[in-house]
């Protein structure tokens, strides 16, 4: 659905989306076992990109980028530290934490000049080539855990719930 990627400027103009971006976002969704991914900013027209602090010629302007928040199956935000690690595994070209609470992540599908950022520290250069080392996260920490909805009846009382793989 392209509406999720529309520019937030309020103007009615075409939305440009690199088809690789939603494909990789779907991979990220599956890898993290998300309940949802909210796209806070996808495509941006040049004026809006500049208005929100961009250069006016960055990856959002070309439909290559999204600023996202991922949610787990319980509805909790997934740390951008974990999202960054998973995005690295999937092969996003640009990845960065973009807020001080570590809940929002920039991802893009650039094919050169890779960027691994943490805008809490700096927005102008890469801080690492490996988010696992940078954030001190084990690869097993971000593997999606399988969940299963269950219905159980005991003594004519029905219980419903979710089982999560350990």
Predicted regions and their residues:
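A broad, low-specificity signal marking well-ordered, structured residues that form hydrophobic/aromatic
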Residues: 37, 66, 105
């Amino acid at each position: 659905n392209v509406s999720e990627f529309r520019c937030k400027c309020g103007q009615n103009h075409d939305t440009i989306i690199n088809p690789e971006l939603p494909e990789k976002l779907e991979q990220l969704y599956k890898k993290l076992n998300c309940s949802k991914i909210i796209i806070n900013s996808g495509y941006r027209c040049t004026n809006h990109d500049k208005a929100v602090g961009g250069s006016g010629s960055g990856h959002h302007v070309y439909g290559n980028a999204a600023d996202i928040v991922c949610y787990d199956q319980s509805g909790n935000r997934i740390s951008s530290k974990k999202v960054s690690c998973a995005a690295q595994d999937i092969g996003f070209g640009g990845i960065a934490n973009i807020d001080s609470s570590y809940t929002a992540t920039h991802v893009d599908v650039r094919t050169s000049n890779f960027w691994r950022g943490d805008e809490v520290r700096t927005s102008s250069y890469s801080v690492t080539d490996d988010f696992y080392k940078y954030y001190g996260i084990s690869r097993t920490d971000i593997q999606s855990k399988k969940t299963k909805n269950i219905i159980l009846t005991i003594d004519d009382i029905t219980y419903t719930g979710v089982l999560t793989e350990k």
